Regions:
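Alpha-helical structural segments
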Residues: 4, 8-15, 19, 33, ...
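Residues in soluble alpha-helical coiled-coils and helical-bundle/repeat scaffolds
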Residues: 46-50, 72-76, 93, 184
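Short coil/turn segments at alpha/beta junctions that flank glycine-rich nucleotide-binding fingerprints
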Residues: 20-23, 95
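An extended, acidic
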Residues: 78-208
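A general secondary-structure boundary signal
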Residues: 11, 28-31, 44, 68, ...
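Helix-turn-helix
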Residues: 23-50, 54
Length: 208
């Protein structure tokens, strides 16, 4: 199956999940919305559990792609980390799967695939990846921190500065996650992040 066709199946599954609990989502209905046979759906994902894993993997990848965009949107280091925190809060507010992945709170309406890898005999590379380990909340903290450090650290940055940068990046992520659980007041997550980070982070790291 072409990647676009797989995406249409995942879109159909996501739409079904928005409308009803995952336990009430039927494979035959997902296939019908996507315009394929139920057997085609099973050939691609293996099972409803496989479909759930693929959907969670896609939403995880989408969230991390948004992190990359946020980090690239500004020159100022604090602005980049604030934008990343804003994206995290917005993505969690607008996407129940992202919220569940970042907090570990799945709820009865959502699929709850095991985060550890499952046996896979799929011939579909994308499904084999989905059947591998899925990120836990602590994994997302590390993934976002590592992405931020890679973007924000200049070539030749001293190790001590890189360590401090990593701490600040993780702080921004954890502030964002706290705002997912308890929405912030006036000023939002942006003010919280900018206030918490050292003032020197208002300049590019290679100017510190």
């Amino acid at each position: 199956m072409m990647p676009a066709a797989r995406e249409s199946l995942l879109d159909a599954a996501y739409t079904a999940l928005v409308r009803r609990p995952w336990s009430a989502v039927r494979m035959v209905d997902v296939a019908a919305v996507a315009g394929v046979s139920r057997q085609t759906l099973y050939n691609e994902f293996g099972s409803k559990e496989g479909l759930a894993r693929a959907l969670v993997r896609r939403e995880a990848d989408g969230y991390l792609a948004g992190v990359d965009r946020a980090l690239a949107a500004h020159a100022d280091t604090r602005d980049r980390l604030a934008a990343t925190a804003e994206w995290t809060v917005a993505a969690s507010r607008n996407n129940a799967l992202v919220r569940a992945m970042l907090t570990g709170c799945w709820g009865e309406r959502l699929p709850a695939p095991t985060l550890s890898a499952v046996p896979s005999s799929s011939a579909v590379p994308a499904q084999r990846r989905a059947d591998g380990p899925l990120p836990a909340p602590t994994d997302f903290v590390a993934l976002v921190r590592e992405r931020a450090v890679a973007v924000l650290s200049a070539p030749g940055t001293p190790k001590s500065d890189t360590v401090e940068l990593a701490r600040s990046c993780e702080l921004a992520v954890r502030i964002a996650l706290s705002c997912v659980a308890a929405p912030p007041g006036e000023g939002g997550v942006t003010d919280l992040v900018r206030t918490a980070l050292p003032r020197q982070f208002g300049r590019p790291l290679n100017h510190l």
